[in-house]
Amino acid sequence: MRANNHFKDFAWKKCLLGASVVALLVGCSPHIIETNEVALKLNYHPASEKVQALDEKILLLRPAFQYSDNIAKEYENKFKNQTALKVEQILQNQGYKVISVDSSDKDDFSFAQKKEGYLAVAMNGEIVLRPDPKRTIQKKSEPGLLFSTGLDKMEGVLIPAGFIKVTILEPMSGESLDSFTMDLSELDIQEKFLKTTHSSHSGGLVSTMVKGTDNSNDAIKSALNKIFANIMQEIDKKLTQKNLESYQKDAKELKGKRNR
């Protein structure tokens, strides 16, 4: 009888131990490995050769861009700063002295800046990166004690949307002399991605042996690098000395009216 009771007691403890191990394992979240193989370089070298310097100054306003939620704040800031830096280089390459204005609003020009600036360049727009609905699938993990991975996955292709608008102004009057807009959805940029997130449930036993991969951040950086290069190439084509000097008559008239 004692042996029988001892066996039952051992079996009960073993059962409790097994249940505890199961509960512990089920409560563990699967590990997600986020790749970091792409650098946000935002490189561009002006294509045209340097031209003869002019005794004219161009005011360069800080870019006013909005971004989709999946673009990190640090990427937003770097994109904005690099845009201003490269446009400044493009204008200098075309023979102009550039005055960088720490504002996106033309109303913040000082009187001295309005007076000495031949032209002003303003930039605004929206930079959106979104999954292509036709080529993106989502797979959610089903709850379960054993075979649930506890990972939700979205796999597909990231594409750009939005626009960048560049406006050329006469600083004293604030009047627009010209503008051009780039439609980002027309760019041939397609970045494959796999985004993995933890499910609303913790997953089953198999989740402790599963490692998820998330390369969506690398896809975003790669897309931003390509968007940046395309934008700069177009700006480089438009902001030539020949084009900018064609506004001289209108700019002089507008500035003269305000000075009277």
Curated annotation (Swiss-Prot):
Pfam families in the cross-refs: NLBH
Question: Which InterPro entries does the UniProt entry name for this protein?
Answer: NeuraminylLac-bd_hemagglutn, NeuraminylLac-bd_hemagglutn_sf
- Source organism, top-level taxon: Bacteria
Residues lipid-modified (S-diacylglycerol cysteine): 28
Keyword Membrane carried by entry:
yes
Q: What keywords appear on the UniProt entry?
A: Cell outer membrane, Lipoprotein, Membrane, Palmitate, Signal
Q: Where in the cell is it found?
A: Cell outer membrane
GO cellular-component terms in the record?
cell outer membrane
- The UniProt annotation puts the region (N-acetyl-neuraminyl-alpha(2,3)-lactose binding motif) at 134-139
Signal peptide position in this chain? 1-27
Q: State the membrane topology.
A: Lipid-anchor
Q: Where is the lipid attached (N-palmitoyl cysteine)?
A: 28
Statement: the UniProt record of this protein carries the keyword Zinc = no
Q: What's the protein here called?
A: Neuraminyllactose-binding hemagglutinin
Q: Which organism is it from?
A: Helicobacter pylori
Q: Which gene encodes it?
A: hpaA
